[in-house]
Amino acid sequence: MIPWLEADDPFPNVSSALTEADGAPGLLAAGADLSAERLLLAYQNGIFPWFSEGQPILWWSTDPRMVLFIQDFKISASLKKTLKKIDRSMIANGRWQIRFDHAFEDVMRACAAPRNGEAGTWISDDIIAGYTRLHRLGYAHSSELWLDDELVGGLYGVSIGNMFYGESMFTRVTDASKIALAYLVRFLGSHGVSMIDCQQQTAHLASLGAMPISRTEFISLLRQAIAAPQIMDWKPIPMFEVN
C-alpha cells in the first residue's frame, strides 16, 4: 500500500517505495498536484511523476536508477560526422540549427504524440502545463534540432543546480533526438554537470552510454549536484573545433 498525498503533505522517504515483489517497483506515492513547488520538491528528492490517462498522479523513485554520466556519452562515427556538419551549419547560419528553449511546449507536445506500437502517452495536458510552469521559472529546458526553421527533433527535462533530469525525446528525421542530446551533453559538461538522470532502464539509453546505479548512490550524487548554483545562460555551443 502506498500513501495518498494531500496538497501540503511531504513525500515519504524514497526507501519506502515498492519493490519488484510488490509488482510496481519504485512506486512511492499517489495524489498531490503538479504545481511547480511540488515538482521541484520531487526532483530534489529523486522522485518523478509518471502516470497514464485516467490514473491519479503517481510518484516514483526507481531502484536501480538509470543515469548517463557525461563522460560516458557514446558518439558513434556516423553521428560524429553528422554533428560536425551541424556545427558548420550553426556557424554559417545554415539549414541545420540547434536551439535551446526556443519552442519548449512544442517539444513537449511532440514527445506526447502517439508512436508506433504505443497505445497512448503519459505526457498529458496536465503534465505539459506543469512543466511549462517550471520552464517559465527557469527550471525546465528543451534542446531542439531545427531544419529549415522546422522543429525535427528534441528533448526536454528539468535542471536544478548541476543536475539534469531527462524526461522525454522525439525525432522526425534520422538521429534527431541523439543530435539534440549530444549538444545538451556538451553544454551541460561545460557547466560542470556530471550526470543526467534517465530514470528507467532501456536498451536505447544503454546504447548511448547510460548505466544503472543504486538508488542510494543516486541520491548521494543528487544531493551534491543540486547544491550547486543554477545554470542561467542556456545557449548551445559547438561540439567540435570546426575549421
From Swiss-Prot:
GO cellular component terms listed in the entry, alphabetical order: cytoplasm
Catalytic activity: N-terminal L-lysyl-[protein] + L-leucyl-tRNA(Leu) = N-terminal L-leucyl-L-lysyl-[protein] + tRNA(Leu) + H(+); N-terminal L-arginyl-[protein] + L-leucyl-tRNA(Leu) = N-terminal L-leucyl-L-arginyl-[protein] + tRNA(Leu) + H(+); L-phenylalanyl-tRNA(Phe) + an N-terminal L-alpha-aminoacyl-[protein] = an N-terminal L-phenylalanyl-L-alpha-aminoacyl-[protein] + tRNA(Phe)
Highest taxon above the source species: Bacteria
GO BP, one annotated term: protein catabolic process
E.C. no: 2.3.2.6
Record keywords, A-Z: Acyltransferase, Cytoplasm, Transferase
Role played: Functions in the N-end rule pathway of protein degradation where it conjugates Leu, Phe and, less efficiently, Met from aminoacyl-tRNAs to the N-termini of proteins containing an N-terminal arginine or lysine.
Similarity field: Belongs to the L/F-transferase family.
Name of this protein: Leucyl/phenylalanyl-tRNA--protein transferase
UniProt source species: Herminiimonas arsenicoxydans
